[in-house]
Amino acid sequence: MEIAGRRVAGVWAAIMSTILSKSEIDAQVRSLGVLVIDDSQYMRKIVRNLLLNVGVREVYEAGDGVSGLEAIRTLEPDIVILDYELPMLNGAELVRIVRSPDVFPLPHVPIIMLSSHADRTRVIEASQLGVNEYLVKPVSAKSLHDRIISILANPRPLVRVGDYYGPQPRRKFPDPIATPRIITEDTPAE
């Protein structure tokens, strides 16, 4: 494989061959069916318009967690965008049900959580539930498009660890109790 006039071999050739072109990404975005679950009709309209503006052609809507869960089951969307705070069944409860492969038929559907809460604990909780991406309202077309591209271009495998079923974490967090190791020139290699 050649990139910028240079021959690339081995691992780099494999990596570069998996990178999607802009036209391939645009085609994938156009083929998506996205379900928006939010109790605010105004917010659903905003997200729907943002999705249509970035090229998504099929946008479905649900106004609460229970109808959203049923819509996931029946419509089988490619991506779900849901509000954290929903009536009848909140976003966290909905994600727990969807990410239960023994109970729910589509545990693999990518989920983007929308919330007006930007605090770290809420983001961590959503991540621990199995959310693929987390966006804070108000959301821009660019940030929503970037998250969709992230899901399409860099899909993370689903893993089951204990009670968790969801996308593999992007990185491991260091153990806060572990003793830091100071490395100097004299430190022996492990």
Segments predicted by a language model, with ranges:
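Two-component/phosphorelay signaling modules centered on CheY-like receiver
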Residues: 41-60
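The feature encodes the CheY-like receiver
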Residues: 87-88, 119
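CheY-like receiver
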Residues: 21, 25-27, 150-190
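Alpha4 helix (beta4-alpha4-beta5 surface) of REC/receiver domains from two-component response regulators
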Residues: 48, 93, 107, 118-133, ...
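Acidic catalytic/metal-coordinating carboxylates
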Residues: 64-67, 90-96
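Active-site residues of response regulator receiver
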Residues: 83, 115
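Acidic, metal-coordinating helix/loop segments flanking the phosphotransfer/catalytic sites
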Residues: 61-79
